[in-house]
Amino acid sequence: MATDPIHQFQISKLIPIEIGGLDFSFTNSSLFMVATVAAAGAFLYLTTSSRGLVPSRMQSVSEMSYEFVASMLRDAAGSHGMRFFPFVFSLFMFVLVANLLGLFPYFFTVTSHIVVTFALALLVIGTVLVYGFWKHGFGFLKLFVPEGVPGVLLPLVVLIEVISFLSRPISLSVRLFANMLAGHITLKVFAGFVTSLGALGVAGAAGAVLPLAMTVALTGLELLVAFLQAYVFAVLTCMYLNDALHPGH
């Protein structure tokens, strides 16, 4: 099982909990989601609680993260979009830290499960819908009626816009899930080659050099993907929130 590339994604019950026939067990996935929130919160607290005139390296990282998300939100949704900053920043930090924790050996990557990423995507789309209807009422439906469309084409265009909107949580969740899943499987496969070849003696160890080099390179690539996927998730969230703020644009 140690060399099985799929085994790392297996969810196991740590504390079985069953209420009324429903399974509410505390799993390894639950544990690492809690660990993700705790790690992100601890990092931000420790790096900003004692700010100095000359920022430390970790304080600079926190401030850069803050400004990065704030700039992203302002560019995508304007100054009014800053009311969603706590929401977008929390999502960005959760996805980023979850991705980074998953790179450690024997750690669990929560973002490699479609259930987790789809729940995050539904949270985003749910926020767009709730705020859009709360702020604009039925005027929010103008989002599905682009300006300047000929009347004869309007029903078809509206249908396409509705389908496109409903597909957003699917594309948002699958993008993150698929990238993390594929990357970790590939990394595990090459790491398995290194272990298997190394067990064959001197000749095997010589043959393990190439897979080892690939493993190191893939680890660096996965580190980049961890940041990139957090960025993509956050920037798409900003774009969707812009629709809630300005449905007629």
From Swiss-Prot:
This is ATP synthase subunit a. Key component of the proton channel; it plays a direct role in the translocation of protons across the membrane. The gene is atpB. HAMAP family: ATP_synth_a_bact (MF_01393). Keywords: ATP synthesis, Cell inner membrane, Cell membrane, CF(0), Hydrogen ion transport, Ion transport, Membrane, Transmembrane, Transmembrane helix, Transport. CDD domains: ATP-synt_Fo_a_6. It is found in: Cell inner membrane. Pfam families: ATP-synt_A (PF00119). GO terms for cellular component: plasma membrane; proton-transporting ATP synthase complex. Belongs to the ATPase A chain family.
